[in-house]
Amino acid sequence: MDISRAEQRILHHLAQGGRIEITREGKAIAEIRCFTRDGWVYPGVDLELFRKLKRKRAIKSSAGKPYRITERGLHLVRSELNNR
């Protein structure tokens, strides 16, 4: 399954140790932020992209923790030298 360039960028950050944190207002998602492994905020994540990655089961959250990349997400992301 092919993934878009924006999805590829986010998955690369997550493969290197990043995370996606969400803020909720009630049940609705209010804010989505992607953090790199160094703690910097990556601005390229919006609600639509987040839902696409979730639908493809490339990211997952467990026990209320931030979203991380899954095994399936690692298979979807193309390897680059800095991700190995």
From Swiss-Prot:
Annotated protein name in UniProt: UPF0386 protein R01313
Source organism per UniProt: Rhizobium meliloti (strain 1021) (Ensifer meliloti)
Family indicated by similarity: Belongs to the UPF0386 family.
Superkingdom in the source lineage: Bacteria
InterPro entries: YjhX_toxin
